[in-house]
Amino acid sequence: MSRLSEPSPYVEFDRRQWRALRMSTPLALTEAELIGLRGLGEQIDLLEVEEVFLPLARLLHLQVAARQRLFAATAEFLGEPQQNPDRPVPFIIGVAGSVAVGKSTTARVLQALLARWDHHPRVDLVTTDGFLYPNAELERRNLMHRKGFPESYNRRALMRFVTSVKSGSDYACAPVYSHLHYNIIPGAKQVVRHPDILILEGLNVLQTGPTLMVSDLFDFSLYVDARIEDIEQWYVSRFLAMRSTAFANPESHFHHYSALPDPEAVVAAREIWRTINRPNLVENILPTRPRATLVLRKDADHSIKRLRLRKL
């Protein structure tokens, strides 16, 4: 563990230092389960779960308990009835990072681990993809080329959803996005019923603004980080692999890429990266990294090697 030479709100760890903080946290995840959680191109193994995610699960367990004590203290000050222990105030975790950096896998593994704790068995995971405007609306606004940028999301609807969950509503509904069809599924809803923990995963969840934003409602946030050059290579590799998986489906919005030979597919992937994903990362996503409670820094082989925890 290292503290920066200048006064800083952060503590930095290498993986060896971080894994020591696991204490006796048990591993309740099998190799078969991990394979089901792993995203395309991801290399996470049980050793990384043990050394990185179990200490994180322990930290979050401690923070959930501390947050509930804080809510109870506020209720006591206000003279309000103590909260029902069976319906605590939901703990909200944000997971941010670039396309292809592995944030979805991070969120799924975290959900699986946290759901195994006795004190918070209901852990829901929602992605912000569902809050993208439908393609017809993006076309009307001339935003199809900006899909994934902050302005392509229905931020008011996202804010209403997270506020509803946080305030203890019996249920809240999120729209559902189809990566196959590259569009919102009309009428489809993901229903969230008063979770103990809600994980919200998306590109821009740590964005700030002149008014209240979803990041203001987070109790904890993660940023999955890596060198831009490494993320680009991961994106290209994933694009190539998807030609024989998701893109191969005739119903896929990107089916026309499935027959491209390697050289042409690489050119197509790098063009998408250069015109959409890299600008969004540099202009909108990367500037939110300092807001994260914990930054997970990956090496070129996808493994998490360093972590930075905000202590203040």
Curated annotation (Swiss-Prot):
Any one GO biological process? coenzyme A biosynthetic process
Query: What CDD domains is this protein classified in?
Result: PanK
> Which family does this protein fall into?
Belongs to the prokaryotic pantothenate kinase family.
The molecular function terms of the Gene Ontology recorded here are: ATP binding; pantothenate kinase activity
Its annotated compartments are: Cytoplasm
Biological pathway: Cofactor biosynthesis; coenzyme A biosynthesis; CoA from (R)-pantothenate: step 1/5
Annotated residues that bind ATP are located at 97-104
Offer one Pfam family short name for this entry. PRK
This chain belongs to the protein called Pantothenate kinase
Q: Does the record bear tRNA processing in its keywords?
A: no
Domain of life assignment: Bacteria
Disulfide bridges in this chain: none
Q: Which PANTHER family match?
A: URIDINE KINASE
Q: State the UniProt keywords alphabetically.
A: ATP-binding, Coenzyme A biosynthesis, Cytoplasm, Kinase, Nucleotide-binding, Transferase
